[in-house]
């Protein structure tokens, strides 16, 4: 069911003329895409909205917001207008013309900014010269559109280049930036988000690590002909994005070499110990960006384990089992092989990885250890004894 048909089922027919689908919901509808949420403008009373299952979130604002969540569909958000004339005010205050569209429940399009023209050409034009001044985070939203193969028109580029935005951005919660970044990682070409940040020199206060990457060698030139760390990160992200749509995996792939930023320049182009350095840096990095514990744990362990993962076939069985156990506990069992393959497309294969993970997760009973024998053993020898049993199971299964 498309957005238009769904909205009709939520309201009685007599109020349909007072409701408009707006913003990205209209954009996605015209592009034939399924959106995550549905945005509406409506000249409805609190009583009418309550009767339709909506609840008020901020009843003291001039344009109160009402929500309803429908399982399996998502969030429906209604901006309550006091009169129909406010629709045009809402439209002109939006970020881009392709998001400044409205549609009646009869399917009539309201296009006051020429948004359809830019929608057809997949070009991004700001609704007004003040669009980014009103909310500088819209710059990162523009970059996010680029990951979906949209193009910034010259006028939009000029508005972004018109000034330095770091002072304004410093007053905006980092969570808002992180949300845009994580959404961008879902795009068809996620590396474009970071390329645009560097191209326009915007976002240093949020991601200072990103802006250092172009000046750091990825490694010895015979192993990294791409040269710098930023180019290397973009290449890996592109490869991983071709293999999975999972944004957490893509995030880990782009920042897996975070530890190389700690290398002293006199040691370039080598980065000895960058895996362990990245483990510690990733925690600070993710905390600063207010990312989830899952992001923090996954990136930390990807930083630490990706080097060994790239040389998986040369590892001793004991190291393989320990690695598999660490990956299992960190929740990166599926992520690590993809990052390893992206990092070394010609040699990052990890044969029998799933078997190693299975064995690493086996209980002492499953590997044939009697409880009484384990309890009779000195505590300091138990872990190694269990490991040897798991190694035997791994070899036997092979």
Language-model segment annotations:
Residues 1-398:
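Catalytic cores of the polymerase beta-like nucleotidyltransferase superfamily
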């Amino acid at each position: 069911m498309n957005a238009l048909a769904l909205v009709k089922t939520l309201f009685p027919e007599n109020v349909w003329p007072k409701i408009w689908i707006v913003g990205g919901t209209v954009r996605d509808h015209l592009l034939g895409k399924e959106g995550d949420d549905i945005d509406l403008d409506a000249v409805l009373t609190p009583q009418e909205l309550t009767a339709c299952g909506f609840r008020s979130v901020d009843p003291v604002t001039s344009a109160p917001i009402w929500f309803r969540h429908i399982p399996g569909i998502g969030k429906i958000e209604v901006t309550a207008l006091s009169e129909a004339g406010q629709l045009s005010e809402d439209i002109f205050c939006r970020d881009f013309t392709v998001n400044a569209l409205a549609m009646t429940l009869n399917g009539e399009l309201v296009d006051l900014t020429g948004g359809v023209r830019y929608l057809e050409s997949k070009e991004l034009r700001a609704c007004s010269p003040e669009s980014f001044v009103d909310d500088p985070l819209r710059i990162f939203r523009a970059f996010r559109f680029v990951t979906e193969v949209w193009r910034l028109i010259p006028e939009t580029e000029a508005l972004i280049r018109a000034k330095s935005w770091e002072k304004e951005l410093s007053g905006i919660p980092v969570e808002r930036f992180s949300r845009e970044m994580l959404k961008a990682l879902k795009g068809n070409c996620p590396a474009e988000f970071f390329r645009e940040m560097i191209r326009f020199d915007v976002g240093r206060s949020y991601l200072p690590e990103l802006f250092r990457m172009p000046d750091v060698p990825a490694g010895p030139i015979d192993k990294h002909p791409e040269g710098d760390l930023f180019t290397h990160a973009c290449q890996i992200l592109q490869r991983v994005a071709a293999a999975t749509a999972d944004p957490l995996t893509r995030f880990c792939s782009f920042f897996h070499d975070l530890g190389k930023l700690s290398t002293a320049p006199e040691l370039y182009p080598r980065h000895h110990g960058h895996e362990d350095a990245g483990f510690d840096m990733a925690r600070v990095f993710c905390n600063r960006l207010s990312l989830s514990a899952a992001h923090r744990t996954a990136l930390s362990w990807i930083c630490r384990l990706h080097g060994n993962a790239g040389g998986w076939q040369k590892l001793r069985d004991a190291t393989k089992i320990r690695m598999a156990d660490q990956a299992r506990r960190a929740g990166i069992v599926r992520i690590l092989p993809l990052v390893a393959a992206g990092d070394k497309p010609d040699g990052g294969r990890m044969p029998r990885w799933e078997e190693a993970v299975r064995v690493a997760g086996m209980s002492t009973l499953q590997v044939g250890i009697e409880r009484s024998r384990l309890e009779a053993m000195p505590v300091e020898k138990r872990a190694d004894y269990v490991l040897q049993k798991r190694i035997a199971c791994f070899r036997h299964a092979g």
